[in-house]
Amino acid sequence: MLILISPAKTLDYQSPLTTTRYTLPELLDNSQQLIHEARKLTPPQISTLMRISDKLAGINAARFHDWQPDFTPENARQAILAFKGDVYTGLQAETFSEDDFDFAQQHLRMLSGLYGVLRPLDLMQPYRLEMGIRLENARGKDLYQFWGDIITNKLNEALAAQGDNVVINLASDEYFKSVKPKKLNAEIIKPVFLDEKNGKFKIISFYAKKARGLMSRFIIENRLTKPEQLTGFNSEGYFFDEASSSNGELVFKRYEQR
């Protein structure tokens, strides 16, 4: 099984590292082209394009400027330890054992606007470039056109390497849109997490994001390799609801805490 998750806007380059092992991203030639485009933008243009504050725009203009083609532990850190959003709060990779990192390296992929596809131990220099941003480039009007089939092809390589054909889609719609399902050599399983609110079950973004991380951790810790094993997920009060599930979609619910 290959697990797909989104990156995070919040980054952590300060906390102590729990592993010294690292690999290098496999699509850096493409990243270099995007950096070339991004460096043309002024901070006010970045602010408008990304809908972020002037302060954040300044930080990200500096990141684009400082980005170097040579990645080292001094200027970068492993992607799975650098991202710090809600998904990664659930994942808690900072508590992984070396064996957990090994399994994750084979079975987990992070989709990225700048790096395309990241393995957990791939070094990553800090950046902000969300997949949905309309950054014009030599290949088209946005990042979806830039990446084209490249991300899908890289995922197919990972699937072939592990010898199976199941993708667990725990990424957001914005990021999964960079994947071409018809060209993906896999059955796609999408876990959906519903929380009860005033007696009704619905997707609550913050909880759903964290649950995607919890599910990723559940798969990694238990070395799961078959999609039917996912129905045993019960972290933090979630339970599998077979009646609400359908082909390709596994629904998990959690009652409101009273």
From Swiss-Prot:
Specify the domain of life of the species encoding this protein: Bacteria
- InterPro entries, sorted: YaaA (IPR005583)
Single GO biological process annotation from the record: response to hydroperoxide
Which Pfam families does this UniProt record tie to the protein? H2O2_YaaD
Q: Name one GO cellular component term.
A: cytosol
Family, per entry: Belongs to the UPF0246 family.
NCBIfam families in the record, alphabetically?
PRK02101.1-1, PRK02101.1-3
The protein's name: UPF0246 protein YaaA
**Gene this protein is translated from:** yaaA
